[in-house]
Amino acid sequence: MSQLYRIILGCIFSLLFIVIPAKAQKEAEVYNVDSSLYAYYQRCQENLLEPVVLSMSDTLFHMAAEQNDQRMQAVALSTRLDYYYYQGNNEDSVVFHTSKVKQFAKETLQPKYYYFAWANRLILYYLKTGRSNIALYEAEKMLKEAQEEDNKTGLLYCYNIMSQIYTIKNFDVMASEWRQKEIELTEKYKLENYNISNTYAQLASYYTTHHQPELAVKALEKAVRTANSASHKILAKLAYVDYYSESGDFPAAEKMLKECRELFDQDKRLDSLKKRFYRTESFYYQRSKQFVKALEATEKQEAEEQRLNEYAMNGEQYRIKGEI
């Protein structure tokens, strides 16, 4: 690394140290990461859909290298992959950067990022571009590898992605069975499962749709309790809106929908989840018989699908991985 680049990184570290808010410092402590790295990562997340994040992710990678933090280096590589994943129109780049993340994760013994890139980016990319059979083929290949290596982290990602695939294929019962397997594996071996809140939220949606309110409430409570990020919290809240809408408690649904709307306005990191918000908003308006507003929300949802190049997917689905 050149002397000039080291000086530039030093300046970035200094500036971040000055402006890091107390909340970010606290979150950095929770995740056991240097606060300046975490603050810069949050800035990357705010620009995840913009080309500038490509250079920012490179900077994050070198900042992490200066700190000898291989985990944040993997995060930086994953952030670059995230950009191409969300663009949705450059398969070669998704495949290439998936391979880069997997290679680095393999070399540094970080299976979490190895399977994240494979499942939550490459396979989900195939799903969101309407190729569920290719996604299933990749998932089965990944499952075989995780089973052969007896890699519990890999199995978690496999079970989760299987649930996504069968949800897309409208095999809801099979999808819920895979989610249950993911939860059981997590609890049995006390595994770190950063996104398990999303799994509980999805399971709650299944119970809501299949008129099992008691099970839905239990899953929703667990989704809230296990939320680790702003995206987890918003998805849990949206699942609650669906539950209230289905059960006819429209005042509660409207109140929580308003809270969600405010969170989206306040936090740019949630931008890629707006499609999910509009889907829930449309469902609420349909159930409360506000059909003109329901149509408007559906049109906004479709516009988001076009923006994220996810129009090939079922409108109920996504934003629920990776994340990273």
Residue ranges and their predicted role:
Residues 37-49, 75-89, 116-130, 157-170, ...:
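Tandem amphipathic alpha-helical repeat scaffolds
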Residues 145-229:
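Solenoidal tandem-repeat scaffolds enriched in leucines and small polar residues
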Residues 2, 22-78, 88-92, 111:
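N-terminal leader/linker segments that initiate helical-solenoid repeat arrays
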Residues 10-18:
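Bacterial N-terminal signal peptides
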Residues 58-65, 99-106, 140-147, 180-191, ...:
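Amphipathic alpha-helical segments of tetratricopeptide repeats
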Residues 31, 71, 112-114, 153, ...:
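Residue signature of alpha-solenoid helical repeat architecture, marking inter-repeat boundaries
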Residues 28-38, 51, 92, 176, ...:
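Hydrophobic positions within repeat-based interaction scaffolds
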Residues 46-59, 88-100, 130-141, 171-181, ...:
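Helix-turn-helix repeat elements of alpha-solenoid scaffolds
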